[in-house]
């Protein structure tokens, strides 16, 4: 009944297994990949014909994590998986980016790839396993896919690269100074296709070494998929790339001159309008059959690409007049919004980001519910890309995959320089509003985010800047690396290479390559140019702000104290009674962590002090020999009970009330009276013994022995 194909190798200290033929047999390609005890199933289906008139490649990738994979039940009212989490969205993009360029040019049939996590051992990250499963499923499906690809995660600890570090090592990257890198790489046998990383100020050489290490480490996986496909692959889909040479030749002859003139216009919107006019002029001269040809859009793109790329390769001139190494003009401004905690307006050419920082308390932290367990994040970065930023009418609604991905890239770039939570106990939310875009808006978010946080008073370890690099690589081997690319250069070029970091090193690297043939020499040149660009941008940013401003007057003040964990219950009280009383009485917000760290927040310093004192009175232990102010709560024949330390009471024996003989404490005391007492010690049952007669009730100072003797002699 089942025709099962199964292959296994030892890889990175774990067993990697690929299996097909038993599950999801009606899909065009189905593979279950297992690394350790983490199993991921990838299923590929594709339409056998393209939709009429379709001029793009409709590839859809869905990565989904099932809670049962880790033995968990989903939270929420409905108790089932709902919309994709941020991690699922990011992993979907992680799978999509390296495989999309590997489909045969001209293939426009719809392809659906669904990747599902079936089992998670909480050691091996499922994203790498998912990429391998997806690659294998595509390779055996028969779809015209020029793979396979392999994938690997690379860490860097103690000066050594580490293949596929454990989940725990990566989850607490920010808290572990030994672990300085989380890099995911994907590629074919001969070429790197995609890199995604967060780093802690690594040098260009260290980052390039990580890329090389990862590419070498994935080679056994690629060989395994090839062997696997030789036994399990379906018949290749009968597809021949369309021949549109005649159509392209006609489009070129009719409109190359006008299109070239349009690309010579430096202002983006004027250039866009001129390109649209050139297209319209060409279309006006085409026949109905040529206008209906589904390859017309491809022919236009090829013409535009040849003009832009040829000018750069042959003359070194870009469409906005810059050479290949120049960064566009930069204007940085801070404190642009009066009532926000921190704000910055970062403008680089025709790309602009308005970035705002808000400081919150512990209750504002994001709770992340993941397969490996719940966690909290005190740093949030949200990226918004409205249609008006590119002068268009378009979809407006919740953030899409691109916005989530760009926001995460900026998050990775900035989180490496954040202060430790113990030094700066705030939740930090950064929002980047892209108000203009002509390339590299995510890197503008990094620059604006750094300025905005410093404007809010966040003590960053160092300012961070980012730059997007591009590449033109021709078939004859000529190439050029471009610094600070425009939108058209991104669209028509061969590489999108984003680098962010400080003066000391790289904090984030993202690379997407559309062609094979990217050599180490090209990558070295790109990293070197990116460093020069980053240093220039940091210099321009420093003109606006070079270090953290004074703390925003509108941000909440936070003080922390650490208490013994066995005292947490006392601070919270039965049913939360005590903590509610503290909050209501003081007016401050109080957040208690399981490790005994308490954060007290308020805009009013007096409220913070009140809450602090109330908590301290509960958890602190009174010291023998110290003098305290208390209140008489009860009088009995043998003495007075005094509340002197938070909710703690002690007994002042009748003999310790005054320097004279008393028959009853009510001769000198009454309930509710404020008194000064000295802690004499504890009896054999642990009860507190207090004294009054040795304390001056007016000053609260201890009466010196000589004075006490004189008082006693006078009374005698």
Curated annotation (Swiss-Prot):
Keywords: Cytoplasm, Magnesium, Metal-binding, Nucleotidyltransferase, RNA-binding, Transferase
Main location: cytoplasm
Enzyme Commission number(s) of this protein: 2.7.7.8
Location(s), subcellular: Cytoplasm
Gene3D superfamilies (UniProt xref): GHMP Kinase, N-terminal domain (3.30.230.70), K Homology domain, type 1 (3.30.1370.10), Nucleic acid-binding proteins (2.40.50.140)
Region (Disordered): 695-716
Leading EC class: transferase
Cofactor: Mg(2+)
One record GO biological process: RNA processing
All copies of domain KH, residue ranges: 556-615
Residue sites binding Mg(2+) per the record: 490, 496
Regions of compositional bias (Basic and acidic residues) in chain numbering: 704-716
Catalytic activity of the protein: RNA(n+1) + phosphate = RNA(n) + a ribonucleoside 5'-diphosphate
General function of this protein: Involved in mRNA degradation. Catalyzes the phosphorolysis of single-stranded polyribonucleotides processively in the 3'- to 5'-direction.
Family (UniProt): Belongs to the polyribonucleotide nucleotidyltransferase family.
Protein's recorded name: Polyribonucleotide nucleotidyltransferase
Taxonomic lineage from the root: Bacteria, Pseudomonadati, Pseudomonadota, Alphaproteobacteria, Rhodobacterales
């Amino acid at each position: 009944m089942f025709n099962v194909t199964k292959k296994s190798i030892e890889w990175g200290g774990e067993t990697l297994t690929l299996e097909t033929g038993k599950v999801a047999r009606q899909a065009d390609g189905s593979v279950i990949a297992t690394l350790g005890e983490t199993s991921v199933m990838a299923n590929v289906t594709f339409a056998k014909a393209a939709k009429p008139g379709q001029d793009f490649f409709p590839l859809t990738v869905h990565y989904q994590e099932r809670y049962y994979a880790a033995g968990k039940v989903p939270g929420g009212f409905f108790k089932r998986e709902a919309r994709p989490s941020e991690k699922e969205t990011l992993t979907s993009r992680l799978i999509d980016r390296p495989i999309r360029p590997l489909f045969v040019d001209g293939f426009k049939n719809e392809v659906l790839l669904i990747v599902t996590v079936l089992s998670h051992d909480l050691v091996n990250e499922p994203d790498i396993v998912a990429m391998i499963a997806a690659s294998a499923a595509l390779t055996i499906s028969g779809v015209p896919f020029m793979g396979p690809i392999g994938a690997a995660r690379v860490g860097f600890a103690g000066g050594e690269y580490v293949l596929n570090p454990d989940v725990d090592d990566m989850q607490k990257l920010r808290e572990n100074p030994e672990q300085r890198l989380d890099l995911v790489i994907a590629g074919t046998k001969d070429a790197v296709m995609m890199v995604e990383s967060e780093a802690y100020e690594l040098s260009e050489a260290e980052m390039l070494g990580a890329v090389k290490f990862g590419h070498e480490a994935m080679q056994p996986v690629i060989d395994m998929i090839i062997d696997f496909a030789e036994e399990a692959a379906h018949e290749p889909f009968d597809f021949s790339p369309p021949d549109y040479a005649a159509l392209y030749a006609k489009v070129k002859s009719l409109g190359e001159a006008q299109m070239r003139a349009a690309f010579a216009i430096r202002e983006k919107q004027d250039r866009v309008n001129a390109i649209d006019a050139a297209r319209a002029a060409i279309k006006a001269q085409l026949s109905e059959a040529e206008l209906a040809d589904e390859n017309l859009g491809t022919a236009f793109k090829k013409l535009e690409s040849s003009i832009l790329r040829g000018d750069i390769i042959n003359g070194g001139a870009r469409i906005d007049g810059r050479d290949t190494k120049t960064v566009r003009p930069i204007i940085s401004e801070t404190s642009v919004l009066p009532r926000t905690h921190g704000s910055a307006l970062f403008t680089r050419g025709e790309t602009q980001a308005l970035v705002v920082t808000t400081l919150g308390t512990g209750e504002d932290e994001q709770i992340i519910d993941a397969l490996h367990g719940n966690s909290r994040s005190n740093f949030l970065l949200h990226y918004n890309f409205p249609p008006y930023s590119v002068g268009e009418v378009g979809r407006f609604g919740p953030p899409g995959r691109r916005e989530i991905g760009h926001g995460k890239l900026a998050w990775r770039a900035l989180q490496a320089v954040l202060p430790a939570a113990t030094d700066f106990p705030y939740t930090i939310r950064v929002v980047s509003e892209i108000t203009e875009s002509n390339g590299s808006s995510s890197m503008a978010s990094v620059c604006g985010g750094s300025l905005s946080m410093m404007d809010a008073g966040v003590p960053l370890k160092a300012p961070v800047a980012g730059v997007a690099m591009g590449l033109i690589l021709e078939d004859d081997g000529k190439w050029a690396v471009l610094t600070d690319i425009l939108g058209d250069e991104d669209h028509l070029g061969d590489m999108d290479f984003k680098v962010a970091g400080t003066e000391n090193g790289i904090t984030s690297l993202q690379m997407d390559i559309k062609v094979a043939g990217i050599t180490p020499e090209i990558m070295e040149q790109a990293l070197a140019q990116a460093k020069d660009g980053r240093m220039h941008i940091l210099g321009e940013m420093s003109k606006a702000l070079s270090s953290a401003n004074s703390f925003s007057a509108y941000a909440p003040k936070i003080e922390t104290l650490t208490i013994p964990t066995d005292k947490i219950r006392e601070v919270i009280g039965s049913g939360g009674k005590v903590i509610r009383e503290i909050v209501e009485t003081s007016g401050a917000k109080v957040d208690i962590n399981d490790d005994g760290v308490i954060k007290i927040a308020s805009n009013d310093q007096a409220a913070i002090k009140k809450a602090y004192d109330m908590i301290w009175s509960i958890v602190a232990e009174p010291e023998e020999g110290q003098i305290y102010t208390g209140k008489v709560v009860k009088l009995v024949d043998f003495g007075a009970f005094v509340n002197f330390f938070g909710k703690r009471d002690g007994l002042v024996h009748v003999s310790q009330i005054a320097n004279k003989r008393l028959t009853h404490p009510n001769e000198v005391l009454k309930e509710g009276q404020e008194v000064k007492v000295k802690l004499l010690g504890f009896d054999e049952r642990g009860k507190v013994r207090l004294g009054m007669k040795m304390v001056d009730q007016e000053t609260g100072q201890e009466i010196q022995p000589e004075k006490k003797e004189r008082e006693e002699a006078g009374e005698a």
